[in-house]
Amino acid sequence: MAAGSSHVSADARKLVGKVAVITGGASGIGACTARLFVKHGARVVVADIQDELGASLVAELGPDASSYVHCDVTNEGDVAAAVDHAVARFGKLDVMFNNAGVSGPPCFRMSECTKEDFERVLAVNLVGPFLGTKHAARVMAPARRGSIISTASLSSSVSGAASHAYTTSKHALVGFTENAAGELGRHGIRVNCVSPAGVATPLARAAMGMDDEAIEAIMANSANLKGAGALKADDIAAAALFLASDDGRYVSGQNLRVDGGLSVVNSSFGFFRD
């Protein structure tokens, strides 16, 4: 079933009875994932600092299936409150999607990067998922089940695709994911991350200074996988659905790359030719 489909039949729904918190859930990948999770039967807490967008999304999804909380992922109190809100409103927490992220200023040289900017990117992109994982595990461990997912990046495995701060944060996030999986597996909790290539989202538009069409054209041209078109936020949502659902019941400690093979191919070698 395609991520963007308007309806999912009852027998095909993968998250019936599940409760999820999605940080950065008001727009981009987070909003696409919230919509898909609800289509598959989940109840979703949208956690974000974009209050108007969050309220609009919840109005779209409906109050029985969703709720919005203001959440700055660098503030531990906010993250703990988002998790507690999910439990208070919907009775439990099954899925934590640490999706909030920032790209930071486009610093092309270390000499142009400030310590404050570097630390801000790490605070959101690395400390945020740490806090989300910590507090999700707090309520998941007694239940002996749960799936924790974080949004990493193509930059978690290749260099030269983003700033030093962003690349560092995503490399470190993969390491944290693996270590957290090692600790939490004994409690029945799976921990994974998703690493997309460039996808047209508000974050990408701001970082690249381009519109959706230009971003998609660049990524489609650089992609190793041809004929599939441009990577969409819906594709990332579908990957998160796999990891959140019982389809991924034995998958933990993994970095699921959704990049059409871009991260494993060095096209400059030119060995494979038509």
Swiss-Prot record:
Name of the top EC class for this enzyme = oxidoreductase
GO MF terms, alphabetically ordered: momilactone-A synthase activity
CDD domains documented for this protein = secoisolariciresinol-DH_like_SDR_c
Report the Gene3D superfamilies cross-referenced here.
Answer: NAD(P)-binding Rossmann-like Domain (3.40.50.720)
Q: Report disulfide bridges, numbered on this chain.
A: none
Reactions catalysed: 3beta-hydroxy-9beta-pimara-7,15-dien-19,6beta-olide + NAD(+) = momilactone A + NADH + H(+); 3beta-hydroxy-9beta-pimara-7,15-dien-19,6beta-olide + NADP(+) = momilactone A + NADPH + H(+)
What EC number(s) does the entry state?
A: 1.1.1.295
Please give the InterPro entries that the UniProt record associates with this protein: ABA2-like, NAD(P)-bd_dom_sf, Sc_DH/Rdtase_CS, SDR_fam
Which branch of life, at top level? Eukaryota
What keywords were assigned to this record? NAD, NADP, Oxidoreductase
Please state, per the UniProt record, what induces or represses the expression of this protein. Answer: By chitin oligosaccharide elicitor and UV irradiation.
**PANTHER family hit by this protein:** 3-OXOACYL-(ACYL-CARRIER-PROTEIN) REDUCTASE (AFU_ORTHOLOGUE AFUA_6G11210), MOMILACTONE A SYNTHASE
Cite any additional comment in the entry.
The phytoalexins momilactones A and B are diterpenoid secondary metabolites involved in the defense mechanism of the plant and produced in response to attack (by a pathogen, elicitor or UV irradiation). Momilactone B can also act as an allochemical (an antimicrobial and allelopathic agent), being constitutively produced in the root of the plant and secreted to the rhizosphere where it suppresses the growth of neighboring plants and soil microorganisms.
Q: Which family does it belong to?
A: Belongs to the short-chain dehydrogenases/reductases (SDR) family.
Please describe what this protein does. Involved in momilactone phytoalexins biosynthesis. Catalyzes the last step of momilactone A biosynthesis.
NCBIfam families reported in the protein's UniProt record: PRK07231.1
The protein's name is: Momilactone A synthase
